[in-house]
Structure formats: structure tokens, C-alpha cells
Regions:
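FAD-binding core of FAD-dependent oxidoreductases
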Residues: 1-10
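A short helix-breaking turn/cap at a secondary-structure junction
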Residues: 12-102
Length: 104
């Protein structure tokens, strides 16, 4: 678990795609979903740590063919979102007006 423990402790948790980070020494539960990832105080720190740990590992063959970014902090530049479309599933927002206002 990464994202739930991080959220209840006021941290940033990032769960990378399987193969980006080695699963060596991770207690196996699901070979298609197991992954390790950073829990940090800031988004920048999570991206920096992911850059450091995202490496191929001979002991974890899934990591050998994964495509990785050379520097995950480069995606934090606001210009990196130019041209990106972000969708909001309106039905999942609920009926509370304060929650709806946050999505607008």
C-alpha cells in the first residue's frame, strides 16, 4: 500500500506502474499489481525519489523492458500540461454543493 497510508498521514504517495520500480524484496501479493513507490512530504520530493529508484533490476524481469522518464521532476513544470485534457466524472462528485464547487 502506498496511497492510502500516505493520505491518512498527510503525505504524498505515488504508486508507479508495474515495472518502473523493482519489486525485489517486496512481499508478493499480486504479480500484476505489486509495486513499490515513494511516500514523501511534497510532490517534488516524490518525483525526485522516483527518479532515483526507477531502475532496471536483473532480479525483477518486468523492470528490464519498462519505459521510464529520465527525470520525473521535469513533469512538474506547469507548461508540461499544455494541450492536456483532464476529464471529471461528474456522477462521482455527489450532491454536496461545496464539493461540486471545488470541481468547478
Amino acid at each position: 500500500s502506498i496511497t492510502c497510508p500516505a493520505s491518512v498521514n498527510g503525505l504524498v504517495g505515488f504508486k508507479p506502474s508495474v515495472g518502473i520500480v523493482s519489486r525485489t524484496h517486496v512481499v508478493p501479493i499480486s504479480s500484476t499489481q505489486d509495486t513499490a513507490g515513494p511516500m514523501t512530504r511534497t510532490v517534488y520530493d516524490a518525483a525526485l525519489l522516483l527518479t532515483a529508484i526507477a531502475r532496471p533490476d536483473q532480479a525483477d524481469p518486468v523492470t528490464l523492458e519498462a519505459k521510464r522518464a529520465p527525470d520525473y521532476t521535469s513533469g512538474l513544470d506547469t507548461a508540461s500540461l499544455n494541450g492536456v485534457r483532464i476529464g471529471v466524472l461528474r456522477g462521482a462528485v455527489g450532491t454536496r454543493t461545496d464539493v461540486k464547487a471545488l470541481f468547478e
